[in-house]
Swiss-Prot record:
Biological processes, Gene Ontology terms: carbohydrate derivative metabolic process; DNA replication
Protein name: DnaA initiator-associating protein DiaA
Gene3D superfamilies assigned: Glucose-6-phosphate isomerase like protein, domain 1
Superkingdom: Bacteria
Job description of the protein: Required for the timely initiation of chromosomal replication via direct interactions with the DnaA initiator protein.
Species: Escherichia coli O1:K1 / APEC
Transmembrane segments: none
Gene name as annotated: diaA
InterPro entries from the UniProt entry: DiaA, GmhA/DiaA, SIS_dom, SIS_dom_sf, SIS_GmhA/DiaA_subfam
Domain SIS: 34-196
GO molecular function: carbohydrate derivative binding
NCBIfam families: PRK10886.1, PRK13936.1
Length: 196
């Protein structure tokens, strides 16, 4: 058991090192995309399933409340938090539309959709991205594995942050770290003189 525990930590560290080498440009582009949208008076919509939903909620909460320092609230909405809306849509046998309907209702040109999917193949996330494209929104996608169907939907203005791993647990860990990096970069760019 001790060796398995050490192996989990070692694999996580190795994934972090690989991501630190591969992802700074994509994370920087994503952060600047989010910052520019906020500066233009737009908002960020976030979605994911399971652990990815938790990461989406963490991002939205960090924008609305704060990340590490006090600052004005920033507009972000986690689309997975309204159980009445989610179950109403799903009850009509539209499980794949639970996020897309919200994107079509709430999203506007200039807004950003932060779409989080470990494999990039979740139908409801894919449909949300398709809806965001019709609303002239920009997409920041956090993925893993080969990026899945989600990667193929992204245009040149969009940003994919693909974790270099084929293990769901490692990808989800890195998605949380990436969300924290994005929050830090947004705060540091918009409020550079705030102390941690």
């Amino acid at each position: 058991m001790q060796e398995r525990i050490k192996a989990c930590f070692t694999e996580s560290i190795q994934t972090q090192i690989a991501a630190a080498e591969a992802l700074p440009d994509a994370i920087s582009r994503a952060a600047m995309t989010l910052v520019q949208s906020l500066l233009n008076g737009n908002k960020i919509l976030c979605c994911g399933n399971g652990t990815s939903a938790a990461n989406a909620q963490h991002f939205a909460a960090s924008m609305i409340n704060r990340f590490e320092t006090e600052r004005p609230s920033l507009p972000a909405i986690a689309l997975n938090t309204d159980n009445v809306v989610l179950t109403a849509i799903a009850n009509d046998r539209l499980h794949d539309e639970v996020y897309a309907k919200q994107v079509r209702a709430l999203g506007h040109a200039g807004d950003v959709l932060l779409a989080i999917s470990t494999r990039g193949n979740s139908r409801d996330i894919v449909k949300a991205v398709e809806a965001a494209v019709t609303r002239d929104m920009t997409i920041v996608a956090l993925t893993g594995y080969d990026g899945g169907e989600l990667a193929g939907l992204l245009g040149p203005q969009d940003v994919e942050i693909r974790i270099p791993s084929h293990r769901s647990a490692r990808i989800q860990e890195m998605h949380m770290l990436t969300v924290n990096c994005l929050c830090d970069l947004i705060d540091n760019t918009l409020f550079p003189h705030q102390d941690v």
